[in-house]
Amino acid sequence: MTVMDLNSDVGEPFGAWGMGDDAAVFRSVSSANVACGFHAGDPSVMAQTCRDAVAAGVTVGAHVAYRDLAGFGRRFLDCSPTELADDVLYQMGALEAVARAAGTTVRYVKPHGALYNTIVHHEAHAQAVVNAVKAFGGDLPLLLLPGSAALRAAEKAGLRAVPEAFADRGYTPEGTLVSRRDPGAVLHDAAQVTERMVRLAEDGTLTAVDGSTVRIHAESICVHGDTPGAAAMAAEVRAGLDRAGITVRSFA
């Protein structure tokens, strides 16, 4: 039996500012990356998102970020590893509190935005994230980019490192994401994306931007829900996996 997780970023409204269609996303995914207040979300949004996840039977993960609410966590923060570890631990603890009140717990951790991209190569910040997860306890899995410094650090620390793929992103022949500055970086055709993700789940390969075949090891697929048409694409990917007989289930 082939099993694949679908994850998405949720809980990103802040105060009167809305973002994404979490209700639609929850109908499609098995794991929810809940913003913890540092790049998006607030205590009330976090609490309601956890309640909605419980109602939908979706696993809750902590979507931790640099302390960059104004920039939506998309800007690098040149902080010390100790400060970063403290920030990540703080975010995990905050989400765990509201998750428990909602009847669930934090089951995994996924870095967001600039933090996610930085710890692909930044050894010190990668280790800081791992240290925070270890300090939190429970040896939670980390959802990370294959081949990243963070993935190696997590495995070295005895944590489960779960590699993920991105449904709507193009890949280079080397198996890395095409830069958003280059053609083919973002895919918009839902049928094409669905076909690619079914193929990935079945045989672990994708067609790279140059037409070659590239092997991608992924235990989870990220489907975005915060851009126009993205929730519908997530639903189509889920339906395609279901039709192919692939079991969609959280890794955590």
From Swiss-Prot:
Record has Lyase as a keyword: no
Catalytic reaction equation(s): 5-oxo-L-proline + ATP + 2 H2O = L-glutamate + ADP + phosphate + H(+)
InterPro entries attached to this UniProt entry: Glyco_hydro/deAcase_b/a-brl, LamB/YcsF/PxpA-like
Keyword RNA-binding in record: no
Annotated signal sequence range: none
An MF annotation (GO) of this entry: 5-oxoprolinase (ATP-hydrolyzing) activity
One Pfam entry name: LamB_YcsF
GO biological process, one term: carbohydrate metabolic process
Oligomer status and interactors: Forms a complex composed of PxpA, PxpB and PxpC.
Stated family: Belongs to the LamB/PxpA family.
NCBIfam families registered for this protein in UniProt: PRK05406.1-3, PRK05406.1-5
HAMAP family recorded: PxpA
Protein name, entry field: 5-oxoprolinase subunit A
Species of provenance: Kocuria rhizophila (strain ATCC 9341 / DSM 348 / NBRC 103217 / DC2201)
